[in-house]
Amino acid sequence: KEYNVRRAFEAGWGGVVWKTLGSEGPPIVNVSGPRYGAIWGADRRLLGLNNIELITDRPLEINLREIKTIKRDFPDRAVVVSLMVPCEEAAWKAILPLIEETEADGVELNFGCPHGMAERGMGSAVGQVPEYVEMVTRWVKQNSRLPCIVKLTPNISDICQPAEAAKRGGADA
């Protein structure tokens, strides 16, 4: 949200990755209770955390307006917009110009989320198939001037394969 990013930038942060945006479609319903779960070891030491939040449930147009306002007010700070849309070229072609209009500094392709969105053919459902990673990354690079960061899923046996696919597709990072 603009409020949170503004507070961060006023505190001196140099950049942010905006919460993952999606295209218009079936509504996203996030949980209203605790968003994180703890994984405890046998000795009750904290081993890790797991979140259960999906992509933003806020309308795309509100996020785009807020990103544009933040970039106007903080032109020297980096704003990378995280994206997760269906694995269809038309969906990526439609959203990329909207992101460019905000003056964002880059896009992150969210191929990592293992829950909630994989059932819709997004997130880790893309990140687990190197051919999809390469294909979508290439679409983004062909249709946008923005630097492209590919966020991969850890839910795969060999992360090198999708990483190499992202590189072949033209990812900047």
Labelled PLM ranges:
Residues 6-11, 15, 72, 86-173:
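Alpha/beta enzyme core
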Residues 1-80, 84-89, 93:
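N-terminal capping/small domains of soluble enzymes
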